[in-house]
């Protein structure tokens, strides 16, 4: 098994609950994923609208089985699989894939949540899972990037509740 992370990155993952790896995929690989997200009819035709608590819209698509598309191949790639096995300490499997197409500055948001809270409700009794996020565009606080609560992986499962606006 090839390790794609150094010891400091691995330690950060276990301590903080996440690790950011810039340039994990090279420019050519990233460009292929970007083009597929915009041009592949299998993706474009299956996006659906998801409204946030303020009524703003984010387009998304989710599927459970990695297919032969570039996204399925990426999910099964040595880079992803070996990295996740290294971080989680054993064999891993694909749980689901999701594309979130959020328009910068105006698109909808995801309310604060803990992924394990969703996984638990879907039958995953232990938090022995991880999310891989591949940003295809520049993500900043100004345009609505993913934000995380460092160390929240050590809090146990946090039940989700819908908040009224």
List each model region and its residues.
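Conserved hydrophobic/aromatic beta-strand scaffold that supports enzyme active sites
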Residues: 2, 18-20, 131-135, 148
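Alpha-helix initiation and capping sites
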Residues: 27, 74, 126, 140-142, ...
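Short, conserved beta-strand element in jelly-roll/cupin
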Residues: 113, 121-141
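Non-heme Fe(II)-dependent double-stranded beta-helix
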Residues: 1-16, 21-122
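Double-stranded beta-helix
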Residues: 139-165
């Amino acid at each position: 098994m090839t390790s794609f992370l150094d010891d400091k990155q691995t330690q950060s993952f276990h301590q903080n609950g996440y690790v950011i790896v810039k340039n994990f995929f090279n420019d050519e690989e990233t460009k292929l994923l970007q083009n597929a997200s915009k041009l592949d009819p299998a993706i474009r035709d299956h996006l659906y609208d998801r409204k946030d608590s303020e009524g703003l819209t984010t387009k998304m698509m989710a599927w459970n089985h990695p297919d032969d598309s570039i996204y399925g191949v990426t999910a099964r790639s040595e880079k992803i699989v070996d990295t996740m096995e290294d971080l989680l300490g054993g064999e891993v499997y694909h749980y689901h894939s999701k594309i979130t197409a959020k328009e910068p500055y105006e698109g909808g948001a995801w309310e604060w949540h803990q992924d394990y809270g969703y996984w638990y409700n879907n039958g995953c009794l232990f938090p022995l899972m991880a999310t891989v996020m591949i940003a295809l565009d520049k993500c900043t606080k100004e345009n609505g990037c993913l934000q995380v609560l460092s160390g929240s992986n050590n809090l146990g499962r946090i039940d989700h509740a819908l908040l009224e606006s």
